[in-house]
Amino acid sequence: MIKHLRSYCLYLAWLFSCIGTLMSVYYSYILNVEPCLLCYYQRICLFPLVVILGIAAYREDISIKIYTLPLALVGFGIAIYQVCLQEIPGMTLDICGKVSCSTKLFLLGFITMPMASAAAFCAIACLLVLATKSK
């Protein structure tokens, strides 16, 4: 049963990357929320995952983990850093520009955008580690 579920990990990772990308685009272009610098860096890690994981899932190409796992882990690290900026008093980033990286915007009323981003990157990374080829 577990082996059967592991064959769908690439599809699930692709789904998480699609949802994250759609949320990012929705907040930026529909709700006109200007992203901070760290959000842009997270997007640099997330947006290519949609294409790469989509193709890999379609072709059942597990070897893609070599390329996608570093993107997911770097994105996760940036998201965790931004969570720390928001949650730890006194932490600031001087290069943020107009929009502060420590500004809290809540999704669904209880989770901040960097926390959601960290959860998505963590889920993608875990799914990539668990992914196996179906037989």
Curated annotation (Swiss-Prot):
Cross-referenced Pfam families: DsbB
An individual GO BP term: protein folding
The keyword Chaperone appears for this protein: yes
UniProt keywords, alphabetically: Cell inner membrane, Cell membrane, Chaperone, Disulfide bond, Electron transport, Membrane, Oxidoreductase, Redox-active center, Transmembrane, Transmembrane helix, Transport
Main location: membrane
Family matches, as HAMAP family: BdbC (MF_00287)
Biological role stated in the UniProt entry: Required for disulfide bond formation in some proteins.
Name of the protein: Probable disulfide formation protein
Organism the protein comes from: Chlamydia trachomatis serovar D (strain ATCC VR-885 / DSM 19411 / UW-3/Cx)
